[in-house]
Design a protein with these regions (language model features):
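Short catalytic/ligand-binding loop motif for oxyanion handling, primarily in non-cytosolic enzymes
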Residues: 1-3, 44-47, 78-81, 94-97, ...
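Residue-level signal for well-ordered alpha-helical scaffold segments within enzymatic catalytic domains
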Residues: 3, 20-23, 27, 248-251
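Short glycine-enriched, charge-decorated loop/helix-capping segments at active-site entrances
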Residues: 5-12
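Short linear capping/connector segments at secondary-structure termini
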Residues: 6, 39-41, 263-264
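Conserved Class I SAM-dependent methyltransferase catalytic core
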Residues: 14-91
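Flexible, glycine-/basic-rich loop-and-beta segments that form/coincide
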Residues: 80-155, 159
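C-terminal target-recognition/interaction regions appended to catalytic cores
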Residues: 145-264
């Protein structure tokens, strides 16, 4: 489902993948899969005032599926902030061990509960609260997955670094100054954002030092590419997240063979 760019949701051309998929499901009839899982960004809950979420769930309900959803953040497993909505539908008897009578705040936050409350009665009757085990506590932060001595050519120029710093608000610049005051190696994840300030669209660079990366994008994605601002001995240096680092953030071991070319 397309929620980037024009945010056309289920009506966007790229969302034809869902309708094409659903047409195949409907034609299967008794041969249709008993369990279906769909993944999308959390923004689906509010897309077109919740109508896209309702439409999608209604397709499952009308086809005789029980359906529920969970919001799961990759931060539970890896130092990357990447919240995704997982819609799980099942036709047939539901194992009691996989369902619960009420939402779980870990996987069913208020935004999801509010979207469920807004469902029409017929679709609401098909809703199920899925039960998930809690994952073990994450034991790595962003710094643990970064290369301390990357190839020299990946570093951006001093001018590019200063230009990015100039795009920061005082709050974010203070965070950088605090890192510069510490002689130890440190790295913060940086995104460029368009913010509305005094009715004008302004490009801002925003940095986080919480041991987390922001949501990684694909080369063809519509969001800002993530950068790293590395500080050591009072010097700031700027570079992108490397392909191998991105793979680590996605949970892949270093033994995984990356394809040729840029992948992050």
């Amino acid at each position: 489902l397309s929620l980037a760019g024009g945010r056309r949701g289920l009506n966007a051309p790229r969302s034809g993948a869902f309708w094409g998929f659903w047409n195949v499901i409907e034609k299967q009839r008794e041969r249709a899969p008993k369990t279906i899982v769909i993944e999308n960004v959390a923004g689906l809950l509010s897309s077109h005032n919740g109508r896209d979420f309702t439409t999608l769930l209604s397709q499952f309900a009308d086809a005789g599926y029980r359906v529920g959803a969970m919001l799961i953040d990759a931060a539970m497993f890896s130092p990357q902030s990447r919240q995704r909505l997982f819609i799980v539908a099942h036709k047939g008897k539901l194992p009691a061990s996989l369902t619960r009578d009420h939402p779980d705040a870990v996987f069913h936050p208020a935004t999801l509960c509010n979207a469920v409350d807004a469902l029409p009665d017929q679709t609401r009757m098909a809703w199920v609260w899925w039960r998930l085990p809690y994952p073990p506590r994450r034991n790595a932060d962003l710094a643990a997955l970064l290369d301390r001595n990357p190839p020299e050519h990946v570093w951006r120029s001093e001018d590019a670094t200063q230009k990015l710093l100039a795009q920061m608000t005082p709050l974010h610049r203070q965070r950088v100054e605090a890192a510069l005051a510490d002689p130890k190696w440190n790295a913060g994840a940086v995104f460029r954002r368009i913010r509305l300030e005094k009715n004008e669209r302004v490009q801002r660079a925003e940095i986080r030092y919480d041991g987390m990366a922001g949501c990684l994008r694909t080369p063809a994605g519509g969001s800002s590419k993530q950068l790293l601002l590395v500080t050591e001995h009072g010097r700031p240096r700027l570079r992108p997240v490397l392909a191998r680092e991105a793979a680590r953030l996605m949970g892949l071991e270093d033994s995984y063979r990356l394809p040729l070319g840029e992948t992050n």
